[in-house]
Structure formats: structure tokens, C-alpha cells
């Protein structure tokens, strides 16, 4: 369920703003989105795994807060990220 280091590096390379960027909202949202997608696949198979479902809800809430922050901070970056990730909003 956890992301491999290689996959995390790929996501960081794809969404980074500058050379040493690992913590910008875009990178954090992209990593959370990947984790959420993986957990969704897990929960489709294991429907009664309520502990993982709670973790999923926490991740979705954290991503929502980061998206709200980015929307308030820079709407252009927000719209670009939404289109790249294919999120509804």
C-alpha cells in the first residue's frame, strides 16, 4: 500500500516547482493522490478493512485542505494541478 521510493521520486520529478522541491503543495497533493488511488484499489478488494478506510478519509481531508490552500494562494497553479491530476472540482 505504501508508495515505493522510486514511484515517489517520479511524482516529485513530475510536479516539482524548482530543483530541490519536495514539499510544495503540488508535490504533496500529487503524492496524496497516488496514495489515495492505491488505497481505493485495496478497499475494492477488502471491503471490510475499516482501519484502512479511516486512513483513506484522513488522506482525502488532508488533500482537500492542501487544495483549498493552493486555490487561495495561486488560482493558476491550482487549475493546472487539477487538470494534470484529473481531479474533479
UniProtKB/Swiss-Prot annotation:
Protein name: Small ribosomal subunit protein uS15
Pfam families: Ribosomal_S15
Species in which this protein is naturally found: Geobacillus sp. (strain WCH70)
SMART domains (alphabetical): Ribosomal_S15
HAMAP family xrefs: Ribosomal_uS15_B
Domain of life: Bacteria
PROSITE patterns: RIBOSOMAL_S15
Protein family membership: Belongs to the universal ribosomal protein uS15 family.
